[in-house]
Amino acid sequence: RRDESWVRGAVCEQYDRIQVPVLAVSGWNDCWPNTVLRLLENVDAPCRGVSGAWGHVYPNLGVPEPGIDFLGLALAWWDRWLRDIDNGVMDGPPLLAYLQASHSPTPVPSARPGRWVAVSTWPSPEVSVMTLHLAPHCLDETTVVFSEVKVFSPVWTCLTSGEYMPIAGVSELPEDQGCDDALSTCFNGPVSDQVLELLGTPLVHLRVTCDRD
């Protein structure tokens, strides 16, 4: 339940209280990958964001790779906002994001293929929203009316999903999750031969009921 104990420490409940410059950094394999984008979208103070491939580690460690010169970026940021040195750190893109390419699943934090993109504003007019509707055991771009889907997930489901907060630099990332799919209720879209680049925060709307305590 989202009561006052959660609201008190939640940034999303009080963006207007953030009045200092913000350098937001996270990784797509971290447990908080969406925070950077939300800060860029809602904070009125000077704000820049960096989202890389790494997990819950400093970007200069870069696990998974590629890393960045985070120490240099942090030093330039502090020189600008703590020492009032006009060093052009705000001339960089508001969002620097690593677009990961498709790769075979491996829990080992090796280098991830992809490329860095500089995004001039967020939300970006170059990013469009794609809506996919749940249909019986599939995804569809058109609305499909169906009554219900029953879900029963054994407690041992998701053993191959990886750690929630990968930090140790060992085999913590998702591996082939075919065995978990076999135990799950899945909604899969058709195989596409078109290039699809994803950048943003996924959102799902569900209506859920439970017949057990």
Across the structure, where does each feature detected by a protein language model lie?
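Active-site-proximal cap/loop segments of hydrolase catalytic domains
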Residues: 1-90, 96, 102
